[in-house]
Amino acid sequence: VVMENFDSNEQMYIKVANGESYDILVPSDYMIQRLIQEGYLQKLDHSKLDCLDKLCEDVVGLPYDPENEYSIPYFWGSVGIVYDKTKVDLEDLEREGFDIFKDQKYKGQIYLYDSERDSFMMALKALGYSMNTENEGELQAAYEWLVECVQTMDPEIVTDEIIDNMAQGRKALGLIYSGDATYVMSENEDMGYY
């Protein structure tokens, strides 16, 4: 078995689009949809998958592959905030939510995940908009929110290194996937997930 890890869906997409061949890919929902639309995925042979009837109904038949012809769920989670309980006031998190990433109290103490999709989700949620909006005004406001955050908060923009860095308590808070946050919290009892 040869396994190759990618820092992002986009890195994986470039390899696939340039002709690299893989037996199994583990991308996110939006990338599955793109790979299907562009003809890069083969249909699954459901007769060889004895687990289909055991999958949670909440994660099958999703809009990007309604019949699960090309994909089955591997895991699911959310994007949230990992924080150092010794450095971040829980009341700040509860009051500010994602706006905590613009709280000057934490300037220079934040990680942002190097993902356009996740960053825009954070900004849209902070502004009270749907993370799936197509409204140009809302998207522009989210862009401006992100620009202000980067220009005023001195964030470190990272990918998977956030996991070990937060486990070691190097910053106060960061945008992270829930599964990664679970690992961080298992390594450092001072860490929480919001």
Task: Map each language-model feature to its residues.
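Short helix-loop capping/hinge motifs at secondary-structure junctions, enriched
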Residues: 86-95, 128-134
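Early extracytoplasmic/lumenal segment of secretory-pathway proteins
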Residues: 1-34, 164
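Small-molecule pocket liners
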Residues: 77-80, 121
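Extracytoplasmic
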Residues: 19-21, 27, 67-69, 76-78
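Alpha-to-beta junction loops
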Residues: 18-27, 40-41, 106-109, 168-176
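Ligand-binding pocket segment of bilobal, Venus flytrap-like solute-binding proteins
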Residues: 111-115, 119, 123, 131-194
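Hinge/lid segment of periplasmic solute-binding proteins
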Residues: 33-76, 90-102
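Short loop->beta-strand "edge-of-pocket" segments that line small-molecule binding or catalytic clefts
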Residues: 99-114, 127
